[in-house]
């Protein structure tokens, strides 16, 4: 029996999670994608198949403040706060958190905690 690579394990977990995580207009899905260098988060209405708002470490607003954000928990918390601010501005207070198959630890946890502190409920 062969062992799956880390990427395949993440994809397998994500497929398993997506069976149950469905966002709608009243409670959209906060989806997180984590790469080696960056973290991306977006609030998605699955019923209309639209992205309501998004934020990432490569966002123009964050690049104006600093030249390059490192791939650490501090950057993830900045992205979480920015995403929560944008979602609340569009009238969204409750979301369903989709960790994207990643373990709820480190950068993903930092983003979630920052979004909660900024006012999102999940």
Curated annotation (Swiss-Prot):
GO molecular function: 5S rRNA binding; structural constituent of ribosome
Keywords per UniProt: Ribonucleoprotein, Ribosomal protein, RNA-binding, rRNA-binding
Gene Ontology CC: cytosolic large ribosomal subunit
Subunit-level organization: Part of the 50S ribosomal subunit; part of the 5S rRNA/L5/L18/L25 subcomplex. Contacts the 5S and 23S rRNAs.
Family named by the database record: Belongs to the universal ribosomal protein uL18 family.
PANTHER family with a match to the protein in the record: 39S RIBOSOMAL PROTEIN L18, MITOCHONDRIAL, LARGE RIBOSOMAL SUBUNIT PROTEIN UL18M
Name under which the protein is recorded: Large ribosomal subunit protein uL18
Gene this chain is encoded by: rplR
């Amino acid at each position: 029996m062969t062992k799956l690579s880390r990427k395949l394990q993440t994809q397998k977990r994500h497929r398993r999670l997506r069976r149950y995580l469905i966002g709608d207009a009243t409670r959209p899905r906060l989806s997180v994608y984590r790469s080696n260098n960056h973290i991306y988060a977006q609030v998605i209405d699955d019923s209309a198949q639209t992205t309501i708002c998004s934020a990432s470490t490569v966002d123009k607003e964050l690049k104006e403040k600093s030249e390059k954000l490192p791939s650490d928990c501090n950057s993830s918390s900045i992205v979480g706060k920015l995403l929560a601010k944008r979602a609340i501005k569009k009238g969204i207070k409750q979301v369903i958190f989709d960790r994207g198959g990643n373990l709820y630890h480190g950068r993903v946890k930092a983003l979630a905690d920052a979004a909660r502190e900024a006012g999102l409920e999940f």
